[in-house]
From Swiss-Prot:
Residues 28-104 bind DNA. Residues 15-28 have a biased composition (Basic and acidic residues). This is Transcriptional enhancer factor TEF-1. Lactylation by AARS1 promotes nuclear localization and stabilization of YAP1, leading to increased Hippo signaling pathway. Delactylated by SIRT1. Residues 1-31 are annotated as: Disordered.
Length: 426
């Protein structure tokens, strides 16, 4: 990676001045029952994150450990709610829901031929596949299992869980109120029914479900604070994080937001969001809503390191330029440009920008944000704070990926969260 530097003028001080079902009986001593609303919410989120995998194990990239699906669901419930559910309890609940879902299909299908066909497909599916499958529901136009919402703060967008790794960074879209008009993902109708184990399409599952195109894909992105507790240990806190995810064809496609809704939040001059989108390719543009985790102790000491790590991959060998523009009230405040060369790993070209130092402006901005007494004050400041990330092919100047990032402060119990949208212009 070539040396890089931040350039900008406005100080953060100046900027801050401007800116469940009752039939399911409990089987342990939990007063709310085994599948209370918060546990059911986490259970449904985990179903969306971890696709059915039969007897195979899922490897968590952050840990390198192998887990069965039910283990991961139980683990996720523990992380989200603090309540312990065993993998056997998870398995039992999946079977209960599968039977209920089968009855639901059966009762709503009036045509006997369609009913027989649906039952034939479901007979070949496991309980996990029936509970996780969305294809049959979508094609029949049947409602899915209702999911309770987070008790949210104003300004959160409506929506569902997306893929991500459980832990300190959840890929969740907290919901209540809608900031921009959201367009649901549209898929072409397919006649008949398909079991969850149907042959995979020729395109990879991540396309249309994550940040990426056929030329370049974002694998991971994080902004973090690393503090040295003692000579032998470091504490790492993630402000924002997009983790590596194992996408499934049953995962929903990304929703769309009209790019004109956010033009005023980003620079309009040469190289701004509007000009870039006009040049295209338009499938390379994404909006990321981050709920930043500021629930950490920030100390002014020499042992603190503020950094950003990102990783991309491609089937092509390129030299890429990564531009990060920090914006306030739609105006660029500071920009960092980095050049990265490809490394061939496991049959693909990898571009990794590791532990890139944050600029002084961002560090001071985080400090001042933390000193605000109320969360609504922080969110008020963040309404006028955005970041534009643009990855370009250095030789052809083609835009490979563009991520327009907007921010709110996460509820401390939820940790860092995010949700991804496609940017379109209808």
């Amino acid at each position: 990676m070539e040396p890089s530097s931040w350039s900008g003028s406005e100080s953060p001080a100046e900027n801050m001045e401007r800116m469940s079902d009752s039939a399911d009986k409990p089987i342990d001593n939990d007063a709310e029952g085994v599948w209370s609303p918060d546990i059911e919410q986490s259970f449904q989120e985990a179903l969306a994150i971890y696709p059915p995998c039969g007897r195979r194990k899922i490897i968590l990239s952050d840990e390198g450990k192998m887990y069965g699906r039910n283990e991961l669901i139980a683990r996720y419930i523990k992380l989200r709610t603090g309540k312990t559910r065993t993998r056997k309890q998870v398995s039992s609940h999946i079977q209960v829901l599968a039977r209920r879902k089968s009855r639901d299909f059966h009762s709503k299908l009036k045509d006997q031929t369609a009913k027989d066909k649906a039952l034939q497909h479901m007979a070949a599916m496991s309980s996990a596949q029936i509970v996780s499958a969305t294809a049959i529901h979508n094609k029949l136009g049947l409602p899915g299992i209702p999911r309770p919402t987070f008790p949210g703060a104003p300004g959160f967008w409506p929506g569902m869980i997306q893929t991500g790794q459980p832990g300190s960074s959840q890929d969740v879209k907290p919901f209540v109120q809608q900031a921009y008009p959201i367009q649901p993902a549209v898929t072409a109708p397919i006649p008949g029914f398909e079991p969850a184990s149907a042959p995979a399409p020729s395109v990879p599952a991540w396309q249309g479900r994550s940040i990426g195109t056929t030329k370049l894909r974002l694998v991971e992105f994080s902004a973090f604070l690393e503090q040295q507790r003692d000579p032998d240990s470091y504490n790492k806190h993630l402000f924002v994080h997009i983790g590596h995810a194992n996408h499934s064809y049953s995962d929903p496609l990304l929703e769309s937001v009209d790019i004109r809704q956010i033009y005023d939040k980003f620079p309009e001059k040469k190289g701004g969001l509007k000009e870039l989108f006009g040049k295209g390719p338009q499938n390379a543009f994404f909006l990321v809503k981050f709920w930043a985790d500021l629930n950490c102790n920030i100390q002014d000491d020499a042992g603190a390191f503020y950094g950003v790590t990102s990783q991309y991959e491609s089937s092509e060998n390129m030299t890429v330029t990564c531009s990060t523009k920090v914006c306030s009230f739609g105006k660029q405040v500071v920009e960092k440009v980095e050049t990265e060369y490809a490394r061939f790993e496991n049959g693909r070209f990898v571009y990794r920008i590791n532990r890139s130092p944050m600029c002084e402006y961002m560090i001071n901005f985080i400090h001042k944000l933390k000193h605000l007494p109320e969360k609504y004050m922080m969110n008020s400041v963040l309404e006028n704070f955005t970041i534009l990330l643009v990855v370009t092919n250095r030789d052809t100047q083609e835009t490979l990926l563009c991520m327009a990032c907007v921010f709110e402060v996460s509820n401390s119990e939820h940790g860092a969260q995010h949700h991804i949208y496609r940017l379109v212009k209808d």
